[in-house]
């Protein structure tokens, strides 16, 4: 902020024309005169937007200090944009001016209308303090007392043990505990995580060199897998009763609610200018859904209100050195559900329900999740029986982190994490109890007793789509025969004709399989059968059906099942039944590549 301070015999002004940013003002302020006053010409700047209260307080102190020194009790606050070329948004500027006015207690204050063209005249006194300038900078706040955390292990029996004294027979849970206790260096490795090689080798996804670091491009197979994961998350939320919505990807930082919520993530944001407005690209779907909830007239009967959005792209400006394949990016896909609840009792009930969705996704995706429950110590002490109920419900130990005070919008959350091959967590599903955002975004519901702030649950039933695929690939990299879940495999059945004369029957088989909503292709290339089968193995195709002379005569197929290695003769219907049993009730999309491999381009 820039201030130009003048001690004057008088100042008088008259508004001439309203700009598009003009505030509504009473007639008495459109023309005014004040004598024996300190005039503060004020220009709010872009950097003020993240610390409106602090900047206004510092400005009021500076103005009051000079007014006291020149022995006047009269102050004129005069908006004056010409003091800076880096102006704050009009909304922020007006907020700051109004705040300064309210803070100048003990002074007679005249604030000239904001956003109006004005003519003015003044007579400046000639003493040494009659003309002064000040720059107000948002100061770094003193470091808060470090939040202390303690780790415990809560068992299904209700026994809680300091994490340092807990001995687990589950190697993966033990690794999660070690990581959270800061002992992960014992397991760290500088080697590239195997999913990075796999995502390229399997023609799923690659880095995009023409974009910013941490932005990916999805190849046809990867796009298909990603879309299926998106469909899965959508169905999980909708079948649970959530209503899908879609909201913008950028938000105005001059909104105090937006800037305060954004500040929770520090500097990890993409920011841009839209004309004179400072905007940010969202890092989650909170902003749009909270704005939607704010605009709704909610009554008690409307709750719980469940909204779901696939944030097709969320943005976090992670440090370049932290960017890792599918594990951490700057642009990612986040399924996001928010539930407005009547009170904490209802929020705790739906917390458990939504945590079930997270564990279900692990089963459906063939990913083993470990649970980390984080809470303030005060919340845990008040809700100990409920936390014990969670461990009992899911029949597993929970790593519990207790924080000495609340530093986020949540009082508790549960993260479900898989392990990568370096034995570090990949956090995927999460459920959080938010006690702050309803008030910040002015989200209310009405009861007979009056207005109330709802408690809001933040839930991602699967976690970020990229991380989900990362967890799947990292887990499969350790398997003797790696494979995607059959419902996610780009090609679920590959038909391999021994020679060209079997191609027509191969087409007939593929047609039947395709009509059963199974993704199928035909390896019609001029290669040996062994090479074709090996190629299918490299692509992790779960079912390979070879057709030779004997199979065509018998109208059968020589099928190899990838995971089991089992080889058996099947009819087309038997193959279809076998595959359908594995993909039943899971999302389906058709093959998006040429069905004939001879016509299929290579992307890697």
Annotate the PLM regions.
Residues 1-30, 34-54, 63-66, 76-90, ...:
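Auxiliary tRNA-acceptor-end handling modules of aminoacyl-tRNA synthetases
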Residues 75, 98, 514-579:
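C-terminal structured "cap/appendage" subdomains that terminate the fold
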Residues 102-103, 361, 389-394, 507-520:
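Short helix-loop-beta junction
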Residues 116-119, 250-254, 288, 407-409, ...:
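Short acidic loop-to-helix transition motifs that present clustered carboxylates
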Residues 276-278, 294-296, 305, 309, ...:
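A translation/RNA-centric and nucleic-acid-associated enzymatic feature enriched
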Residues 360-431, 602-604:
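Metal-assisted phosphate- and nucleotidyl-transfer catalytic regions
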Residues 363-386, 483-505, 569-570:
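Conserved, charged catalytic cores of large soluble enzymes
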Residues 480-532:
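Generic long, charged, amphipathic alpha-helical segments
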């Amino acid at each position: 902020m820039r201030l130009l301070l003048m001690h004057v015999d008088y100042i008088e002004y008259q508004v001439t024309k309203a700009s598009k940013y003009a505030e509504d003002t009473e007639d008495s302020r459109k023309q005014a005169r004040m004598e024996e006053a300190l005039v503060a010409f004020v220009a709010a700047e872009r950097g003020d937007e993240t610390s409106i209260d602090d900047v206004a307080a510092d400005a009021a102190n500076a103005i009051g200090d000079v007014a006291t020194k020149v022995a006047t009790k009269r102050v004129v606050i005069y908006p004056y944009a010409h003091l800076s070329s880096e102006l704050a948004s009009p909304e922020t500027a007006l907020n700051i001016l109004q705040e300064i006015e309210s803070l100048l207690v003990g002074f007679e204050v005249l604030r000239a209308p904001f956003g109006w063209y004005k003519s003015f005249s003044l007579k400046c006194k000639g003493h040494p303090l009659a003309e002064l300038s000040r720059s107000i900078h948002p100061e770094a706040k003193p470091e808060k007392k470090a939040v202390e955390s303690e780790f415990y292990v809560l068992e299904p029996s209700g026994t809680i043990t300091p994490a340092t004294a807990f001995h687990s027979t589950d190697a993966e849970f033990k690794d999660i505990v070690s990581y959270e206790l800061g002992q992960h260096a014992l397991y760290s490795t500088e080697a590239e995580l195997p999913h990075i090689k796999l995502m390229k080798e399997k023609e799923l996804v690659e880095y995009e060199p023409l974009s910013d670091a941490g932005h990916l491009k999805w190849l046809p197979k990867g796009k298909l897998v990603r879309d299926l994961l998106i469909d899965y998350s959508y169905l999980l939320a909708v079948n649970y009763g959530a209503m899908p919505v879609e909201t913008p990807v950028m938000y105005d930082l001059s909104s105090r609610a937006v800037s305060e919520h954004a500040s929770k993530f520090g500097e990890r944001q993409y920011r841009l200018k839209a004309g004179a407005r400072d905007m940010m690209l969202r890092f989650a779907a909170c902003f749009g859904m909270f704005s939607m909830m704010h605009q709704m007239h909610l009554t008690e009967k409307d709750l719980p209100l469940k909204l779901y959005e696939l944030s097709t792209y969320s943005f976090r400006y992670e440090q370049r050195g932290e960017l890792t394949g599918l594990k951490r990016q700057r642009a990612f896909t986040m399924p996001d559900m928010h539930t407005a609840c009547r009170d904490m009792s209802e929020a705790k009930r739906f917390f458990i329900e939504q945590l079930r969705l997270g564990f279900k996704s692990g089963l459906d995706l063939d990913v083993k999740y470990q649970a980390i429950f984080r809470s303030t110590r005060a919340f845990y002490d008040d809700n100990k029986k409920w936390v014990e109920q969670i461990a009992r419900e899911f029949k597993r130990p929970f790593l519990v982190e207790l924080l000495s005070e609340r530093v986020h919008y949540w009082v508790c959350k549960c993260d479900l994490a898989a392990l990568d091959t370096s034995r570090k967590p990949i956090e995927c599903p999460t459920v959080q109890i938010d006690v702050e955002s309803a008030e910040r975004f002015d989200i209310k519901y009405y009861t007979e007793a009056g207005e109330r702030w709802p408690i809001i649950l933040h839930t991602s039933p699967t976690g970020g789509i990229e991380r989900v695929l990362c967890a799947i690939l990292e887990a499969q990299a350790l398997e003797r025969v790696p494979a995607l879940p059959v419902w996610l495999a780009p090609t679920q059945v590959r038909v391999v004709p021994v020679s060209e004369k079997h191609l027509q029957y191969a087409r007939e088989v593929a047609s039947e399989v395709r009509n059963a909503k199974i993704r199928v292709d035909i390896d019609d290339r001029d290669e040996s059968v062994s090479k074709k089968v090996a190629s299918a193995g490299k692509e992790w195709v779960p079912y390979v059906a070879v057709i030779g002379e004997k199979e065509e005569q018998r109208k059968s197929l020589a099928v190899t099942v990838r995971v089991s290695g089992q080889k058996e003769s099947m009819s087309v219907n038997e193959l279809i039944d076998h595959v359908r049993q594995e993909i039943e009730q899971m999302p389906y999309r058709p093959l998006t590549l040429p069905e004939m491999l001879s016509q299929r381009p290579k992307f890697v």
